[in-house]
Amino acid sequence: MRKSIFLMHCKIGEKMKKIAFYGKGGIGKSTTVSNVAAALTKKGYKVFQVGCDPKSDSTVMHNGGKRPATVLGCIRAGGGEDESEFLFRGTSGVFCIEAGGPQPGTGCAGRGIIAAFERIAELNIYEKYSPDFVLFDVLGDVVCGGFAMPLRGGYADEVYIVTSGEMMSLYAAENIVRAVKNIGNPCRALLKGIIVNKKNIEKEEEKVAAAAEEMGVPVFFTLPRSMEVQKAEALGKTVVEAFPGSEMCAEYEKLAEKIARG
């Protein structure tokens, strides 16, 4: 059955662009994805954001800072038969799903991602809603079979890696690049490049540029460090929603536009 779901995802959504964002935990990946999703929605696109992390906090900035119900949480409770149980539309208009994960110490988080993706496929959610973009926000510290799910079977068309110039962040990025290259099925996602989320460490852009060259991956976009990000998070919102006229909002909008152009 799983194979048929993979094949189905290879065929559907000719107009829909499915994009996976990977990166080390704590690097600002979810913040980046959430602001890109909000910026694309602001442009008039229908956007889905799918959180693929057992912490289930990818979409909190579309939900007033609160964690929503998850696919796996609904399944564990004996539900999950209707997407209304776990799909919600955020304050900025983004459609949000959190895959969720097992109870701590009781199972494999990667397997949980697989189970959640299968339920989303069984309910034909993307066919029903016809989004323009589906953004997968994926934990990139460990790229096991489950967390590599968006790279397989046509779930994602493109992959971006979010990193800073910090050593461990770049190490995680290198592992993600290896994972993308190791997946050789016909629907392998295209690695588009690195999004630098600056931490303002010494010679940061030079360090990322050198690492990117070594990995054979281009630097796609560089986001400056801004206190507006923390201020927006304190409000439980994206920068795009909380500070629409700010310089940081303009940066996220530029990134979203570049991603949309492909």
Task: Please name every model-derived segment.
Residues 2-15:
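Short, Lys/Arg-enriched N-terminal segments with co-localized hydrophobic residues
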Residues 235-246:
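C-terminal boundary of histidine-terminating zinc-finger modules
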Residues 25, 97, 116, 137, ...:
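Residue-level signature of catalytic and energy-coupling elements of molecular machines
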Residues 101-111, 167:
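Flexible beta-alpha connector loops of hexameric P-loop NTPases
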Residues 122-129, 133, 138-222, 231:
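Conserved catalytic-core segment of NTP-binding enzymes
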Residues 17-54:
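Walker A/P-loop phosphate-binding motif and the immediately C-terminal alpha-helix
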Residues 39-99:
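N-terminal phosphate/diphosphate-binding loop that engages ATP/GTP or pyrophosphate donors
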